[in-house]
């Protein structure tokens, strides 16, 4: 059993060393075996083979004491990596039996090849006879051998058989490797046998090793390498790499044009007669005429004629054969199908189905289709070789017609794009030609003499009353600038084509931007209604446009444009658009004047600049290039504003005097001048206005002031009125109380009522009205004969029905007097109400309210309004049950 090797230092290696140590200590030694090996051993090289069964019959564990070697189950010794043996090397094979037979050890001694003798000792070397090594015998096996099996292959013999009893064995592919058990050897005779037939296409050769060992496992010979080569048998027929192959070739191609190359495969041994292939064409479909041939050795298919015509046959099929053995009749063969498609060429010119066409169209019709023409083309449809391109060769010098191709039907579509005039031309003859998108390629056998087919189209124009004509569409007339009003100008003239004159036509102006003209309805002439001005913003490039419509009696019309070209007149003097000039003393002591002239160049520069006598004392002006001038102070001027009168003339003397505002400033550039400009100051004054928020603030302020004055007036008037309590005051009163909590117990004679305080009186401002008079809040109350007043010391407002008259009382009693008066009476009445509830409930009584107070506008408010009696609280004795909750609330619990 083979054991995988482990790297030194690993855990597995440590365990392996421990196992070897145990085996060495407790195992018996078998016979030593010496093996002759070369001094250099490659990795996985076979060192030798040992008969392990002679030492231990059944070994379950096979180990090597040296990690440079590994031992197989059959006793073969292999290296684990490349080794260089300078001298002998020894190691042990350790065998262990799990059935209890013990452990065995086989010592292996490797003897390296002969030592090299230094050159200086070459003469001292003794010539010795070396032992002849058993040489391999060349051997081969026939593929697909019929036997009988086992079939004798070869015999190996070792010269050591003269001195030892030699046993032979083999290993390698076919023995202990795939394919297993193909070869075996008789260990006594060395005869090697083959057990079955071999397929060379699967195994070309078998490299195996033969071993010669003694009974005790000694190997007196090196392993003998044997190579059994399998001789090829022609058992594989060639076949085409692709069963169906498609080639393409242009039609009408030259003779000898390569169509394609076919390739076949033969699995037999290369470079032998078994793989020497020959190609030939067995059949061409269709067969007549024969167009193709194939090279027998290379398989290249070529054309044999230039007469390939796709329109006759677009596809050919070739049945081809490939045969080995150089094409001999006894060689193996196979067939395949080759499809050759012909590529279309533009070898057929399109042609019209009709030689001539006739069509009618009404005059003045445009963008209308008048005719469709079909063509035939034998080339491949929907390709550049068959798509038609039409041309109008003659008769369309004015561009009246347009011809195009319908992409769906390939027809020619003839259209009218400009109106036809029956009065000018009643019939038009067109010559139309057709070509393909692709260039024409004439075939060898073609009889075509021209590549373009033509046809004739006769277009007859039908008469139609189309109305007036405005020809030309734009008419130009010249006029002087500044032409006065009332001047007549030649207008636009239209023509009726039916009559050849403009008689009976009417004219109307449809566009006149600045309304300069009026038009004569019958003649179309213009008359000025404004002075013509070339410098107007409506004039572009000295031209002013007027659009005119001409119409006949039937309402048919045409439109024309009249361009009035205005000749320039020197009617505008030079102007300076610079509103204010700034001289920065720290930059330069002058300013540049740049006048403009609205007139044309002939009435413009050069300009002449003349200072007024008053201005020439402080200023000088210098003309630079006839278009600009420099204004400079004669001396250093103070920082201030200046006005400089200056006259500017053009080349013809038209002039104007300008007052130039100039500011001399302490700055570097004009934008840094801190001195506000005259224009900005004037603009600031002109732009001052009241905004909506300012107006609103003023209105609200006025209203607030009026309110304050009115309040002060009212307060002053109230202080001057004598406050008194009239004798005829009403006996019905309402007591204001904000108390929401319960009162004392019913049996308690003292009923404490809360007071209501407010600081509003301190501000002397009315907080509510009753009957149109101001009412102030109360601080303390007093009851006198049913009336309630405020304490005068507190300054509170009266809260009675008489308050509607504006009468207030400063109060006659204090709060304690009022409290002492009402407390015992309320308690007594509540008690009596509870004692005689049944009787008092069923009493039906009437209260008199004969006197309600002088001037009162309201009726009585209850039975408690009787102020004539001081003890006027008897009504509390007759409270109904629904008032019990109110009574309990007023009693302190």
From Swiss-Prot:
Principal cellular location given in the protein's record: membrane
Extracellular side: 133-692
Membrane-crossing residue ranges in chain numbering: 693-715
Membrane topology reported for the UniProt record: Single-pass type I membrane protein
Modified residues (Phosphothreonine): 383
Propeptide intervals in chain numbering: 30-132
Residues listed as glycosylation sites in the UniProt record: 163, 398, 545
InterPro entries cross-referenced by the UniProt entry: Cadherin-domain_protein (IPR050971), Cadherin-like_dom (IPR002126), Cadherin-like_sf (IPR015919), Cadherin_CS (IPR020894), Cadherin_pro_dom (IPR014868), Cadherin_Y-type_LIR (IPR000233), Catenin-bd_sf (IPR027397), Desmosomal_cadherin (IPR009122)
Keywords linked to the UniProt accession: Calcium, Cell adhesion, Cell junction, Cell membrane, Cleavage on pair of basic residues, Glycoprotein, Membrane, Metal-binding, Phosphoprotein, Repeat, Signal, Transmembrane, Transmembrane helix
Post-translational modification: Isoform 1A is phosphorylated on a serine but isoform 1B is not.
Protein localization: Cell membrane; Cell junction, Desmosome
Membrane in keyword set: yes
Signal sequence bounds: 1-29
Superkingdom: Eukaryota
A Pfam family hit: Cadherin_pro
Example of a GO MF term: cadherin binding
Tissues with expression: Epidermis and weakly in tongue papillae.
Gene Ontology biological process terms from the UniProt entry: adherens junction organization; calcium-dependent cell-cell adhesion via plasma membrane cell adhesion molecules; cell migration; cell morphogenesis; cell-cell adhesion mediated by cadherin; cell-cell junction assembly; desmosome maintenance; establishment of skin barrier
Domain Cadherin: 133-240, 241-352, 353-470, 471-574, 575-682
Topological domain spans for side Cytoplasmic: 716-893
Complex formation: Binds to JUP/plakoglobin.
Role according to the record: A component of desmosome cell-cell junctions which are required for positive regulation of cellular adhesion. Required for desmosome adhesion strength between the granular layers of the epidermis, as a result moderates epidermal proliferation and differentiation. Is therefore required to maintain postnatal epidermal barrier function and normal hair follicle morphology into adulthood.
Entry text on domains: Calcium may be bound by the cadherin-like repeats. Three calcium ions are usually bound at the interface of each cadherin domain and rigidify the connections, imparting a strong curvature to the full-length ectodomain.
PANTHER family (alphabetical): DESMOCOLLIN-1, DESMOGLEIN FAMILY MEMBER
Name of the protein described by the UniProt record: Desmocollin-1
Organism from which the protein derives: Bos taurus
